[in-house]
Amino acid sequence: MIWHVQNENFILDSTRIFMKAFHLLLFDGSFIFPECILIFGLILLLMIDSTSDQKDIPWLYFISSTSLVMSITALLFRWREEPMISFSGNFQTNNFNEIFQFLILLCSTLCIPLSVEYIECTEMAITEFLLFVLTATLGGMFLCGANDLITIFVAPECFSLCSYLLSGYTKKDVRSNEATTKYLLMGGASSSILVHGFSWLYGSSGGEIELQEIVNGLLNTQMYNSPGISIALIFITVGIGFKLSPAPSHQWTPDVYEGSPTPVVAFLSVTSKVAASASATRIFDIPFYFSSNEWHLLLEILAILSMILGNLIAITQTSMKRMLAYSSIGQIGYVIIGIIVGDSNGGYASMITYMLFYIAMNLGTFARIVSFGLRTGTDNIRDYAGLYTKDPLLALSLALCLLSLGGLPPLAGFFGKLHLFWCGWQAGLYFLVSIGLLTSVVSIYYYLKIIKLLMTGRNQEITPHVRNYRRSPLRSNNSIELSMIVCVIASTIPGISMNPIIEIAQDTLF
């Protein structure tokens, strides 16, 4: 009899939970329509994989790319709508969040064609790769719109789990296994640190989890200047630092870049930074509103260390992927300047603009590395010597992307950095901007060193890898060329296009 009553109570509770979830999805589902498109694409991929004996590979790529493009279209149609909070305060929809979601979707859309030839040559499992990419994209999008501590913790974990699986995708590669182990261990440690910081924030605010309610809770409990908030700030900064990978939280980055499959590195190098930047701006700007001086100081230290260490260590690297790893550490230092400035002097707009250009510059560079690596089997910088004599298009496009990363005019990277540094200068960050300018000059040195190797014309300096260089017979080569062309064009946008981009970015502020 007791078991019968308990069973009935369980059924009633389960039904009540199901009806509540259905009610939320029915009335709030429109607010996550772009995410729902990706979920539908994931279901289609699973259905095709489980029902088809012979995998229809073109359909898998088509479904993945189409779901990403449709999700971008849904975001654009929703542009300029009024900010809304849905799912009982767990999710917020506004222009600021949506532009970061757009950047993540753009990264994934460009990374899929970039990966086609690599997957075919290495015979990687296609369906699982696409599933992990789409799921990581979904986690990044939910992180951008997260409005409470639980969602801010769960969403990046979804992204991180897929990242661990992608980094170790080539199971027979010892370097890939080592990279995955380091990535997993440090990722788990950083998540523990992050949730510990959240617990201090939760307790200090009187048990609130929504970002704005935390501010109100801190006012009610008079804990906004307490030591508990300082402890929470330190732990949360360390936890988010792992996702952004500034110095000194950068130890995992070079090993993961070097050991992971190159298309995976291309994907992680941009999406993780975009998602973490979106989360950092909201966490620091809202719950830690009363501790702005403290978190400004912490981020300034991280930015200075990142710009100096990242660019100086990059000079000594012999692996192209490790060089780009340290370069990305320096680049995130520039992005942090925009986070510190905030929306008072156009900091967020300049940060968003620079990240848009960084996506194009970085993915364009990785597209060329994927293409060169598949034809030569090497990642050593010296093995690029004389590439211009064999493949002028690849050499010139790689040179343009590297010059844009270095910030040489009239390329997009120059105008992105110029606007970012100008906003920092107007905000009074003179020392930080000066460090940024000096380290940018350092970065130009090691980028030009690679370009000099590319353009070497003397036979005695051309390596055997380039001498035996062969173009790919695969038709999928067209897809990587498409990604490369799009990225190169975006990397070489002249300054005349800066004003409309800045104006659009300004509309994304809170």
UniProtKB/Swiss-Prot annotation:
Catalytic activity: a plastoquinone + NADH + (n+1) H(+)(in) = a plastoquinol + NAD(+) + n H(+)(out); a plastoquinone + NADPH + (n+1) H(+)(in) = a plastoquinol + NADP(+) + n H(+)(out)
An MF annotation (GO) of this entry: quinone binding
TM helices/strands, residue ranges: 24-44, 57-77, 99-119, 124-144, 149-169, 183-203, 227-247, 295-315, 323-343, 347-367, 395-415, 418-438, 482-502
Source domain of life: Eukaryota
Compartmental location: Plastid, Chloroplast thylakoid membrane
Keyword annotations from UniProtKB, A to Z: Chloroplast, Membrane, NAD, NADP, Plastid, Plastoquinone, Quinone, Thylakoid, Translocase, Transmembrane, Transmembrane helix, Transport
InterPro entries cross-referenced by the UniProt entry: NADH-Q_OxRdtase_suN/2, ND/Mrp_TM, Ndh2_N
Pfam families: Ndh2_N, Proton_antipo_M
Top EC category: translocase
GO BP field: ATP synthesis coupled electron transport; photosynthesis, light reaction
Record's bilayer topology term: Multi-pass membrane protein
Secretion signal span: none
Disulfide bridge partners, by residue number: none
GO cellular component: chloroplast thylakoid membrane
UniProt EC number: 7.1.1.-
Function (record text): NDH shuttles electrons from NAD(P)H:plastoquinone, via FMN and iron-sulfur (Fe-S) centers, to quinones in the photosynthetic chain and possibly in a chloroplast respiratory chain. The immediate electron acceptor for the enzyme in this species is believed to be plastoquinone. Couples the redox reaction to proton translocation, and thus conserves the redox energy in a proton gradient.
Assembly and binders: NDH is composed of at least 16 different subunits, 5 of which are encoded in the nucleus.
Family according to the record: Belongs to the complex I subunit 2 family.
Full protein name: NAD(P)H-quinone oxidoreductase subunit 2 A, chloroplastic
Source organism of the structure: Cucumis sativus (Cucumber)
